[in-house]
Amino acid sequence: MNHPTPRRPLLVTTLTAVCAAIASLALPLAAHASSHREAPSIAGSPRVDGTDFYMFKSYEGVAADGTGGRAGYVTMIANYQPLQDPYGGPNYFKMDSNAIYEIHIDNNGDAKEDLTFQFKFSNAFKAISIPIGNVTVPIPLTQAGTVSVPNDPNLNVNEKFTLTLIRGDRRTGNAFVVNNPSGGAVFDKPVDNIGNKTIADYAGYAAQHVYTVAIPGCAMPARVFVGQRQEAFAVNLGVIFDLVNAPVGVITDRNLINAAAANSIQDKNVTSLALEVHQSCLTQGSETVIGGWTTASVRQSQLFNPNPPSGYDVSSRVGGNYVQVSRLGMPLVNELVIGLPDKDKFNASVPSGDAQFATYVTNPTLPALLSAVLPIGNAAPTNL
């Protein structure tokens, strides 16, 4: 579970039944996706905006013959909160405590979740105050000094999360709490990478938040980590959305396939929800293929207080059932395939209902748009 350290300034740090991210456990295939601010509604709710979903066979310490190390494990990473600037203080990028974030696994091919790993976040506000003259005054920052350990005393707000495994339907299935090996059912999340004066060794600090856990009903131990990581989606979004504002020769040059332009998003961060689970705990019977996707859901209603009390994140109350507002499985489906009128609908939908979006796949508009802005001839399909 090694991931790039979050960046700081000047530091390198199913449109069908299978349109969920598909990963074969018998073959070395990987599933990945990407979606940043892709729909009108989610663009206004960055804390629940899923940006990427990765699912692949773990390779840490695995020999060429497929043995040793983490062989037999599957890594799942759901990224949220796109385009985080390293200097985005003083509050940085905490997760939405009123939302639930989920990774779903379909292990029988019916485009419905059979397993759901649900993350729920909370903020422990310490209200750190310091004496100023003859009064004690609350500080305005996330931290009151250097930070080096989980739930550091200098953290004014300590972000925590719970992890629940749900077997069957995500709302009506059987729920099992995943416990912290140190006791209880709550895990600490590392504060974002504020900078090297606050956190001298961010990689070492974050590594203290990798937990080895027991998944209920699973004989093999798993690992979980939630925290800020460097953006891994290497696409120059500015150029792409500006009518592909680059020479065709550059775009099609295989020698430049790994080139990162100056205004790419690799200087941004995301928040990763990472799980590493043994394949025997994800599959069903003799089936060796699983599908996976991630969603975020919020309460149906939110009521803002015109005169909020003192406290942390207490300006509103929420209620009602959870409503799905973000969904991500296959790469770029909602971003570049689904039409603008249906992007919010897609984010609220489930894989088993994807037939309603079939026209966007059978009659795609993106090739025609590319033909209109690039001198590459007729790229649009004609065998419709």
Where are these regions (language model features)?
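Bacterial N-terminal signal peptides
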Residues: T13-A26
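A signal for specific C-terminal beta-sheet/loop modules enriched in small/flexible residues
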Residues: M1-N2, A17-C19, I103-I105
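Intrinsically disordered, low-complexity segments enriched in polar/charged small residues
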Residues: V12-T13, M55
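Surface-exposed extracytoplasmic segments
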Residues: A31-L384
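N-terminal secretory signal peptides that target proteins for export/translocation
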Residues: M1-L11
